[in-house]
Amino acid sequence: MSAKLTSHIDNLSQLRLATIKPGDVFLGEMDGVDHEKFFIVAGVSGNRILCCSVLINSKINPFIMRRPHMLERQLCLRADEYDFLSHESYVNCAQPFKSRLDFFSDAGYKYKGCLSDIHIKQVQDFLITSGQLTQEEIDLYFPSVI
């Protein structure tokens, strides 16, 4: 690949990284899972290096069904609300993923859409009250929410 093309690809990757925001939905691989998963960016650090994300599942896992504190943190999304969904699905706000934001700038992750303002607010509220994030992490990922 030519140096000019490599530079152009790097610039596009940086542009994509600069535009990622809470509510953005990506489809990509997940370690240990045999199919692609939908990820929702729930919060982004002020320096745009770190992010907090959650998964969309096609059904609620039996493990979660037996745990009321986790079950109450599942947000139902209807397929008629989002073009990227083919059936009713559930946002798992009981198990946040913390990673580098550039995780989603990888070419293996495809942008699929964005949650409505109401749904991203619900996701963020569920995460903030989940007990899965420290106060420092809440302040880092959700400074404009608190």
Task: List each model region and its residues.
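Compact nucleic-acid interaction/catalytic patches
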Residues: 27-30, 34-79
